[in-house]
Amino acid sequence: MRNMVSEISDLSLAKEKSEAQFIARNPKSNDFHCKACDSLPGGNTRTVLHGAPFPIFIEAGYGSKLRDVDGHEYTDFLNELTAGIYGHSNPVIKKALMQGFDEIGISLGGTTTCELNYAEALKSRFLSIEKIRFCNSGTEANITAIIAARKFTGKRAVIAMHGGYHGGPLSFAHGISPYNMDSQDFILCEYNNSTQFKELVNSSQDIAAVIVEAMQGAGGAIPADKEFMQTIQLECEKNDIVFILDEVMTSRLSPGGLQQIYCLKPDLTTLGKYLGGGLPFGAFGGRADIMSCFDPRLPGSLSHSGTFNNDTLTLTAGYVGLTELYTPEAVKRLNALGDGLRKDIESYCHNTKMSITGLGSIMNIHFTESGRVNSYNDTAGEVIELKDLLWMDLLKEGFWIARRGMITLSLVLTESELEAFKLTIKAWIHRRMSLIRI
């Protein structure tokens, strides 16, 4: 067996070579990045898209394809980190937006039937939602759901999960950040640890809510154990704690969201991403008694305003996308394709540091010394250089994924594109076997 020093040296050389090729292939992206640094801190306004030596600048998207400013075309296997489920410039969405401009208009400053129609459509899909409100992002939905839980219970503390992500000010990848919103009010639990969760619930009488993903998205597409989620639901019910299920990413995994698969009935559900039809969107909803905290007819109710909460274009695009494109049949088909893709890639990973996690149309590639990822803790020792190498090598082959290894599918990907991606991954494993073999 080759020693670890040699392996690290070989990996460093391979990455340096790929990075040099990356720089040579993308001079215009480099130039745009340098120019952007004059106006934007680090040339960036969305941290997740930053990466050394510089990010690729995308010029256009069409169907399942992206084109960058240097003229390279990619098949998109990231799809806006789950938000781009309809592909790029979907004709049905485009038609709905143009009709919205022509027949409804924008910036109306009043209540419209758009919000009523979409609220009813979402309620019919996500059965735990009795009442719903709209906002502008999944982050805002999660923040406002926590505010509702505090108002409803009169309590303050919130249990979140290590590795969880509920928006920039609610990020728990490295514990509780002192820069998180109300960081002193959060209690952290290990994901999939039912025993610890019960202990935390019993340790305080001031817990207003639990916020959790049934599959950690930004944390690496790590699914929850069903027993863990059932424990959360039961303990919340027993202790008058509001159970907030973050389905901003995962609502796409079945017709009724991941809560349908896990047989859950959360008190509040948060939504976002693709449900805006490609435009900024967030929503939160659930039990009518909790949501009545926002009923402006009631004394002492919470104020929840936002100029674009009922934006006509977003609600029109979201409604058309959900009712005409991402129908229950389409949901099942897309997630079956995702399960098949993940299982095929998994079969290529035997005896390597590479593994793949996820459910349905959302998945994530990992590189660990053991070749196994069963919890967020297992990602602590990820070989980031291998993720970087895979990402740069896939760019050369014309495929776009997240640098962190995330893959999400869209409705417009064809079976031939899926097959080409699988074969490229298989060939990459063979080519880089000396670097990834256990």
Curated annotation (Swiss-Prot):
It is found in: Mitochondrion. It comes from the Eukaryota. Pfam families: Aminotran_3 (PF00202). The modification N6-(pyridoxal phosphate)lysine is found at residue 273. Keywords: Aminotransferase, Mitochondrion, Pyridoxal phosphate, Transferase. GO terms for molecular function: glutamate-1-semialdehyde 2,1-aminomutase activity; pyridoxal phosphate binding; transaminase activity. Its EC number is 2.6.-.-. Gene3D superfamilies: Aspartate Aminotransferase, domain 1, Type I PLP-dependent aspartate aminotransferase-like (Major domain). It is an enzyme of class 2 (transferase). The keyword Mitochondrion applies. GO terms for biological process: porphyrin-containing compound biosynthetic process. Its cofactor is pyridoxal 5'-phosphate. GO terms for cellular component: mitochondrion. PANTHER family: GLUTAMATE-1-SEMIALDEHYDE 2,1-AMINOMUTASE, GLUTAMATE-1-SEMIALDEHYDE 2,1-AMINOMUTASE 1, CHLOROPLASTIC-RELATED. Belongs to the class-III pyridoxal-phosphate-dependent aminotransferase family. This is Uncharacterized aminotransferase C417.11c. It comes from Schizosaccharomyces pombe (strain 972 / ATCC 24843) (Fission yeast).
